[in-house]
C-alpha cells in the first residue's frame, strides 16, 4: 500500500485515525505528524486535521486531550465510558494530554502553504488556541514556574511503556481495579505491547484522575506518578520557539512566550547528566534522575538548547547505538538491560522520533548522522511497509499495520 493510500484509508473526513482497528480515534501528536503528510497531498486537508483537533478536543481552560472520541468503537480500551468525560464535551475526550508538537507543525503549514490568504486565516484562528494550550501546560503542570512541566501519566509522554517509567510507575497502587478487557492484544501480538502489570497501573492512575474530576491542582498534588519527561519538555521548548515565531509573523505579543523559552532552556539543560553525557528525565516524587538512556534523551537537539559540545557527545552516543543496532534510532540504548527490540517503546525504532532527532542533528551540523536516521527510516518502511514501529536489530515491522504517521512522514521526508 502506498503512503497516500494509508492516509486515505485512515481518513475519517476531517481527522485521521492512527491505524484502522487498533486506534479508531483521533490522537493529539499523531494528528500533528499526520498533518505534515497531508501537506504533500492536500493543503486544505492538512489544516483540517489540526482544526478538528482543536475545535472538538480543546477544553475551555485550554487543555488539549490526547484522544478525541469522535465516534463509538469497540476496538479500543479504555474508551470514553472509562474516562467519564462525556458530559464535559461532545465528542468525549480523554483527561490527559500528549507531547505538544502541534505548534511546530502549525508554523510549518503557515510558512509553506502556497495559498497565503488561507495560511494567514488558519494561523490567526489557531494561534490563540495554541497559546491557551501552552498556558494550560504551565499553569497545570509547572505551578512553581521552574520552566519544566511534569507528566502525570506515562501515556502523556507518548512513549507509554518506556523503561524510564518502570520505577516511578511501580509506586502506583493497584487497588480495587474493576475487571477489564484489553483490545490492543487482539490486533497485535501481546509480546509487542505493554504488559498487564503496566496496564493495571495506567488504569489506576486514570481512575484516580476521574475521582478527582480531572482537577489539575488535585492531580498535581495527588498523582503518585510525577515525572519531568525530557522528551515532552524538549518538544514543548521547540514548540515554544515556533509559537514565538508565529507571534512575530502574525504581529501578536510574544512576551509571555519569550518568558517560557528563557525558563525552559535553563530547565531543560538542568536535565543534562555530565557523567553520563546524556539527558535524563527526573522523578519528581523520588527527587532523583531516571538514569535510563532512551531516545527521548536526544530530543533536546530538536529543541535547539544544547551547546555544540553537548551535541557532539549526543552524536557519539547515537553512533554507539548504531554500532549495536542495524537500524537507528532504537527507543532504548541497545546495550541496556531494559532493551527489548520488539516491545513497543522498550527498543523499537519509531519513525516520528527518527524525524525529530534527525532534524536536531541536521541543525547542529551532523549531516551524516541525520542522513542515516532518514535513510534507516525510509529503508524500514520500504522493506516492511508503514508499520507502527520496527525491530532495530532485524528490521521486522511490529505493532499496527498501515500506520498513519509512518506514512505521513515518509511523504513529508521525501517531498
Swiss-Prot record:
GO BP, sorted A to Z: oligosaccharide metabolic process; protein N-linked glycosylation
Class of this enzyme: hydrolase
UniProt GO molecular function: Glc3Man9GlcNAc2 oligosaccharide glucosidase activity
Gene3D superfamilies, sorted: 1.50.10.10
Keywords: Glycosidase, Hydrolase
The enzyme's E.C. designation: 3.2.1.170
Activity regulation, per record: Activity is not stimulated by divalent cations and not affected in the presence of EDTA.
Active-site residues annotated for this sequence: 160, 388
Cysteines joined through disulfide linkages: none
SUPFAM superfamilies in the cross-refs: Six-hairpin glycosidases
Temperature remarks: Optimum temperature is 70 degrees Celsius. Activity is undetectable below 30 degrees Celsius and above 100 degrees Celsius.
Catalysed conversion reaction: (2R)-2-O-(alpha-D-mannosyl)-glycerate + H2O = D-mannose + (R)-glycerate; (2R)-2-O-(alpha-D-glucopyranosyl)-glycerate + H2O = (R)-glycerate + D-glucose
Pfam family, one: MGH1-like_GH
Zinc recorded as keyword: no
List of residues binding substrate: 23, 27-30, 76, 98, 158, 193, 344-345
Function of the protein: Hydrolase that catalyzes the hydrolysis of mannosylglycerate (MG), a solute produced in response to osmotic stress in thermophiles, into mannose and glycerate. Can also hydrolyze glucosylglycerate (GG) to glucose and glycerate, with similar catalytic efficiency. Is highly specific for MG and GG, and cannot use mannosylglyceramide (MGA), glucosylglycerol, mannosylglucosylglycerate (MGG), glucosylglucosylglycerate (GGG) or trehalose as substrates.
The protein's assembly and partners: Homotetramer in solution.
Annotated family: Belongs to the glycosyl hydrolase 63 family.
Protein name in the entry: Mannosylglycerate hydrolase
UniProt source species: Thermus thermophilus (strain ATCC BAA-163 / DSM 7039 / HB27)
Lineage: Bacteria, Thermotogati, Deinococcota, Deinococci, Thermales
Annotated gene: mgh
Amino acid at each position: 500500500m502506498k503512503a497516500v493510500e494509508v492516509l486515505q484509508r485512515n481518513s475519517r473526513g476531517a481527522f485521521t485515525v492512527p491505524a484502522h482497528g487498533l486506534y479508531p480515534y483521533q490522537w493529539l501528536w499523531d494528528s500533528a505528524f499526520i498533518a505534515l503528510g497531508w501537506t504533500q497531498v492536500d493543503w486544505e486537508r492538512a489544516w483540517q486535521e489540526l482544526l478538528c483537533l482543536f475545535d472538538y478536543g480543546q477544553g475551555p481552560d485550554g487543555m488539549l486531550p490526547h484522544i478525541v472520541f469522535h465516534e463509538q468503537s469497540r476496538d479500543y480500551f479504555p474508551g470514553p465510558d472509562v474516562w467519564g468525560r462525556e458530559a464535559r464535551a461532545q465528542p468525549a475526550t480523554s483527561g490527559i494530554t500528549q507531547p505538544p508538537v502541534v505548534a511546530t507543525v502549525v508554523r510549518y503549514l503557515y510558512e509553506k502553504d502556497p495559498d497565503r490568504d488561507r495560511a494567514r486565516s488558519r494561523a490567526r484562528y489557531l494561534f490563540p488556541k495554541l497559546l491557551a494550550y501552552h498556558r494550560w501546560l504551565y499553569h497545570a503542570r509547572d505551578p512553581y514556574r521552574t520552566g519544566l512541566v511534569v507528566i502525570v501519566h506515562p501515556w502523556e509522554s507518548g512513549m507509554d511503556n518506556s523503561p524510564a517509567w518502570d520505577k516511578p510507575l511501580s509506586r502506583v497502587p493497584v487497588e480495587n481495579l474493576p475487571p477489564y478487557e484489553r483490545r490492543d492484544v487482539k490486533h497485535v501480538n501481546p509480546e509487542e505491547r505493554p504488559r498487564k502489570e503496566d496496564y493495571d497501573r495506567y488504569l489506576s492512575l486514570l481512575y484516580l484522575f476521574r475521582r478527582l474530576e480531572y482537577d489539575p491542582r488535585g492531580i498535581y498534588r495527588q498523582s503518585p506518578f510525577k515525572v519531568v519527561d525530557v522528551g515532552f519538555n524538549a518538544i514543548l521548548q521547540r514548540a515554544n520557539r515556533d509559537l514565538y515565531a508565529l507571534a512575530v509573523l502574525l504581529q501578536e505579543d510574544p512576551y509571555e512566550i519569550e518568558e517560557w523559552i528563557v525558563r525552559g532552556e535553563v530547565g531543560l539543560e538542568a536535565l543534562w547528566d555530565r557523567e553520563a553525557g546524556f539527558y535524563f528525565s527526573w522523578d519528581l516524587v523520588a527527587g532523583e534522575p531516571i538514569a535510563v538512556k532512551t531516545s527521548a534523551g536526544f530530543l533536546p537537539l530538536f529543541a535547539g538548547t544544547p551547546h555544540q559540545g553537548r551535541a557532539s557527545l549526543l552524536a557519539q552516543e547515537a553512533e554507539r547505538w548504531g554500532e549495536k543496532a542495524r537500524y537507528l534510532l532504537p527507543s532504548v540504548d541497545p546495550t541496556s538491560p531494559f532493551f527489548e527490540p520488539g516491545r513497543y517503546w522498550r527498543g523499537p525504532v519509531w519513525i516520528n522520533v527518527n524525524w525529530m532527532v534527525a532534524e536536531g542533528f541536521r541543525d547542529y551540523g551532523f549531516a551524516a548522522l541525520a542522513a542515516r536516521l532518514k535513510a534507516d527510516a525510509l529503508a524500514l518502511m520500504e522493506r516492511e511497509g508503514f508499520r507502527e514501529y520496527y525491530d532495530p536489530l532485524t528490521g521486522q515491522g511490529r505493532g499496527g499495520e498501515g500506520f498513519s504517521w509512518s506514512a505521513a512522514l515518509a511523504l513529508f521526508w521525501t517531498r
